């Protein structure tokens, strides 16, 4: 009887192990403005965030840019209100830029200092504080705040560009305290995000060097987030990811999550070879399910917090910046979600 009971509860235990089964839907307002009306599995028109949460998504990631316009603070407050109505938690991804921030682009916002680190450190603090206080005033709870996006090469260039880790550490410290000093009643988890989550050497070098300056302390942040895209490097195996996530937690004592990932339904001419332990997964809707299941198994095995699927419904950008033609969980011809969306509720 006891053995049978344990077998019956194993799926429940696996589900409970993943705190976050999330998606980044930052582009949703732009899509809706372009006339896209999303359809659920039954073919009925429904808000994207509701479709996702109905299928097991429990957290939504939103990118925040500094300049007024798409992805600005007002854009994100309005999106967060819709997300909050579904019961999903909110994860703000502060790019600290007027445009895309990633390992190749970390452009300082217009009007922010590019020649004085004291001024820039105050600007990142004041901006972060203002963003968080705005959400507090709107009575919107925030679960996670990322102080930068894929900052492997630093943030707020040129002052915060590698190899100037003293400036990087100081800026991260200032950003973190913008969150800590805010009026948010429940303080969000503060997250630092690098790319190539499978590359332990890269992760270790960044954190050892930044923390080694003494200007960023372990108390400044709560989580480490990583991107995991299998189609950018043959070395990006699940085995390597497992090793890296395990080492991150053991070395730094931080909660860890895969905060960006996706899998293609079509990839005719991949720029890079796919990792060996993923080559058997087809480029298809079923393949998306298999990939997310294996990823979830890896995360559960390492006691990681969860994952966020990056832009599953950006129908005007189906390749999502990769060499694959289509990485979406939505059919861009019909705007209907694919059956793979059910994977969130199955992992």
UniProtKB/Swiss-Prot annotation:
The active site is at 150 (proton donor), 260 (nucleophile). Pfam families: Glyco_hydro_53. Belongs to the glycosyl hydrolase 53 family. One of its GO terms (molecular function) is glucosidase activity. Disulfide bonds: none annotated. It comes from the Eukaryota. It is found in: Secreted. Keywords: Carbohydrate metabolism, Cell wall biogenesis/degradation, Glycosidase, Hydrolase, Polysaccharide degradation, Secreted, Signal. Transmembrane segments: none annotated. SUPFAM superfamilies: (Trans)glycosidases (SSF51445). GO terms for cellular component: extracellular region. Its EC number is 3.2.1.89. This is Probable arabinogalactan endo-beta-1,4-galactanase A.
